[in-house]
Amino acid sequence: MNQSSTKHTKVLILGSGPAGYTAAVYAARAMLKPILVHGIQPGGQMTITTDVENYPGYAEVIQGPWLMDQMKEQAKAVGTELIEDHIKSVDLSKNPFKAIGDSGKVYTADSLIISTGAQARWLNLKS
């Protein structure tokens, strides 16, 4: 793989839900120039959550997609680089850590934050 297909950062964040964007904001504010890699649908499960009633700072109910848009814009505003790619493998055996995307791009990082969230695994039971 040639040098142009490798991108290095101090902090690489995988996942664009609330945890990923929060990590990105704090890393950017610490001048670490983070890169956040997100999939096709950024925002995680919060993008399909209608009413969010337990987020600090909001006395009224807010909408999940709106909150994720706000978090994304804040992460960008403080200097986070957002990249759309799907990470298919990571190598944590040595530093710098390495993540390989479906795009063929190789991401290397001194620190790696994996915040890929959760996915429901439905039981095959009748209701």
What are these regions (language model features)?
Residues Q3-V78:
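Beta1-alpha1 glycine-rich phosphate/pyrophosphate-binding loop at the start
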Residues M1-L14, A30, I35, L82-S127:
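FAD-binding core/adjacent interface of flavoenzyme oxidoreductases
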